[in-house]
Amino acid sequence: MPSDIYRWLARYYDHLFEFRRPFEEAREVIIGPLLPRIYTACDLCCGTGGLALSFASQGVRTFAVDLSPEMCRITRGKARAVGLPLKVICADMRKFALPEQVDLITCEFDAINHVPRKSDLARVLKCVAAALNPGGHFVFDANNRKAFELAWTNTWFADRDPVAVVMHSTHVPGTDKARSEVNWFVRQGKLYRRHQEHIEEVCWTHAEIVQALLEAGFDRLKTWDAAPFFNDELTRPGCRTFWRARKRP
């Protein structure tokens, strides 16, 4: 995956997207019971750093990892602005490494789906397991094929000065891949300059994820359907799943 794939998404992510509340509610249920025993954490595919900064603000020694240099730059800037210690690492989730093992690794906003091949899941989980303390937990959410079938077959538009975005998503029925063509229109004076990005995702069956987690050394697997947390038309039952897994001691 090219490191600049989300250059424009990074630049305007906080300006355009407001998906935080459903994830905050999910964290209370899924991560909340673990927090008293979490002293070190890593947010994998950290985006613009919201969750990593939240951990750091609670006194958790935190790492933030993202492939996008622009996402990393924004996250570092936010940490400096509020005076929080946060180690930001620019790395591919399929081959990242941390300076030390941690108690918790998170990977939100279906970031785990953003790999080129289904076989890459094993590579991601191998790195996650290596970065966790024995008994540590991995918490992530993943889009399922139903999400591709229902939500990745439309066009989404948003306009918030100085940028507008058109996202056209496609999914070939019966496959485990989906693609979005993203057109950014950034205002420059009286004109708009157009920029393009391509976003691709793959998905796995429940059984495939279970097998991959077990083979990577995880146990105590638990899942939650995302629909009750989101309560919107794009996240129907079966579309997105939250996962929690423990690295075997």
Positions of PLM-derived features:
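C-terminal lobe and adjacent flexible extensions of AdoMet/dcAdoMet transferase-like proteins
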Residues: 204-249
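Conserved class I S-adenosyl-L-methionine
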Residues: 1-47
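Residues lining the SAM
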Residues: 108-110
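A short glycine-rich, Lys/Arg-flanked "PGG" loop and its adjoining helix->strand segment in the class I
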Residues: 122-134
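Class I SAM-dependent methyltransferase SAM/SAH-binding core
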Residues: 50-95
